[in-house]
Amino acid sequence: MKSMSNHLCIIRYEESMRQNALDLALRAWAPVFPQMKEAVPGFVYNAFYPDGWQTRQNSDLAQVLDDEPETVDVALVDGVMAGWVCTRIHPEDSMGEVYVIAVDPDFQRQGIGRALMEHSQNRALDAGMTMMMVETSDDPGHAPARAAYEAGGYQRWPVARYFKDLRRPPI
């Protein structure tokens, strides 16, 4: 674990940061996906991640960084990328959304995630939004994220998502 100095700054993402941002996110989520895999039906996990979670996440996140770089902010600690956040604005709902947030494992539990969340919320406020949303999964691997969001004042909206394997004959 790296010690967080007083030199935390959050800056706009630049294309030169792309590979670092992708690598950081994969490191951040490496402990999460094995726990998620155990918690969801195999046919669902395999449909979402047929080539492994790293391949899918890398592709999805690369698309975010390439298609909407203006929505991404990066946390630097002493010049080292410690995390990043993508904030989407949904004016039709007067809502900002933390679409992606990732903190390098070396910088977790040092306030980086909280700082990125606050920065994202300020982006939404500056855009005139009146509420903020973040989504995560209910599996054990995402428990730390849920705790952080709840500690930050986010209230859970009970949502249920169901999947059915259509390759199996009906009962």
Language model features: what each stretch is:
Residues M95, M131-M133:
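Structural preference for beta-strand elements that scaffold enzyme active sites
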Residues Y149, Y154:
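Conserved active-site tyrosine of GNAT-family acetyltransferases
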Residues R88, E135, A160:
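Conserved residues at the C-terminal ends of beta-strands
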Residues L8, R12-Y99, D104, M117-E118, ...:
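Acetyl-CoA-dependent GNAT
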Residues Q108, M133-A145, F163-R167:
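Conserved beta-strand-loop-alpha-helix junction that forms the acyl-donor binding cleft
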Residues T130, Q155:
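Short acidic/polar active-site loop segments enriched in Thr and Asp
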Residues M1-H7:
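Basic/polar N-terminal segments that are highly enriched at the extreme N-terminus
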